[in-house]
Regions:
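Short-chain dehydrogenase/reductase
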Residues: 7, 67, 71, 102-110, ...
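A conserved pocket-lining segment of Rossmann-fold NAD(P)-dependent short-chain dehydrogenase/reductase
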Residues: 124, 137-159, 163
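NAD(P)-cofactor binding segment of oxidoreductase domains
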Residues: 46-90, 107-118
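Mid/C-terminal beta-alpha module of Rossmann-like enzyme folds, strongest
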Residues: 1-4, 10-12, 162-248
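Conserved beta-loop-beta element that borders a ligand/cofactor-binding pocket
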Residues: 94, 99, 111-134, 140-141
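N-terminal Rossmann NAD(P)H-binding glycine-rich loop of SDR-like oxidoreductase domains
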Residues: 2-27
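SDR active-site strand-loop-helix element
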Residues: 7, 32-34, 62-63, 90-95, ...
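Adenosine-cofactor binding site in Rossmann-like domains, unifying the SAM/SAH pocket
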Residues: 33-47
Length: 248
């Protein structure tokens, strides 16, 4: 098997994927990021992509930017894969609800899905629910105020990033699988309840106040567009995530 590229390979998810691929015995795993020592690549302008892509057979595309640029980055990745002529499968990590919740970041992820599907290249797309880490970050940010304000009526189904990395490593094979079944966490809870659990685990004494919001994106979350109840395949619960994390 040829080389495997992991974009965003120094990020939280990408680093986990890289570790799993190497543990599985893959010798040519190429870590791509702007600051990677061997394959420094800037996806926003394509610099370094051709050298990194040479002879590669699989790409696991984990790189993303909440502030925009994902579509441009995907375009450069697709063109580099075409030039290389050896790439048989681009594995892309997406989000459950990108076609249900009109959030700017979600729209960008959906646009990348469509670019990949229209590229003529072999593609595998995995959508997952939000990571435990994201719920913890949202709760931690909200806890900086005297009263913790979290969106009212929003339910989440968080999943462990490690479990998603396991699945991405499984999918990183030359044969593309198209859109594969979604991955959701094992439990669904109100975000406010998980916020309270986070505060209790950290020993933070704050009152959580459900805050009603406006807009189509908020309505999409309230409708449950971000959930995958039929695909609750995750194992680690948010409570277990908090227990393993401790007070950090």
């Amino acid at each position: 098997m040829g080389g495997i590229l992991v974009t965003g390979g120094t990020g939280n998810l990408g680093a986990l994927v890289v570790a799993r691929l190497r543990e599985a015995g893959h010798e040519d795993v190429r870590v791509l990021s702007r600051h990677a020592p061997v394959y420094p690549v800037d996806l926003l302008n394509g610099a370094g992509l051709d050298a990194a892509m040479a002879g590669a057979e699989v790409v696991v595309h984990c790189a993303t930017a909440t502030r925009g640029g994902d579509e441009v980055a995907a375009g450069h990745l697709i063109e580099a894969a075409r030039r290389a002529g050896t790439v048989r499968n681009i594995v892309y990590i997406s989000i459950v609800g990108v076609d249900e919740v009109p959030l700017g970041y979600y729209r960008s992820k959906l646009a990348v899905e469509r670019l990949l599907e229209a590229s003529g290249l072999g593609v595998t797309i995995l959508r997952t629910t939000q990571f435990h880490d994201l719920v913890a970050r949202v709760s931690g940010s909200a806890a900086k105020l005297p009263v913790v304000l979290l969106p009212k009526g929003v339910r989440v189904q968080p999943i462990a990033a490690e479990e998603v990395a396991d699945r991405l490593a499984e999918l990183a094979v030359p044969a593309p699988a198209g859109r594969v079944p979604d991955m959701g966490g094992p439990e669904t809870h109100a975000l406010t309840d998980l916020g309270r659990a986070y505060l209790a685990a950290r020993g933070i004494h704050r009152r959580v106040v459900p805050l009603p919001l406006a807009g189509k994106a908020y309505a999409g979350f309230v409708r449950g567009g971000n959930l995958a109840p039929a695909h609750a395949v995750g194992k680690k619960t948010f409570a277990q995530f908090l227990a393993a994390r401790g007070a950090s």
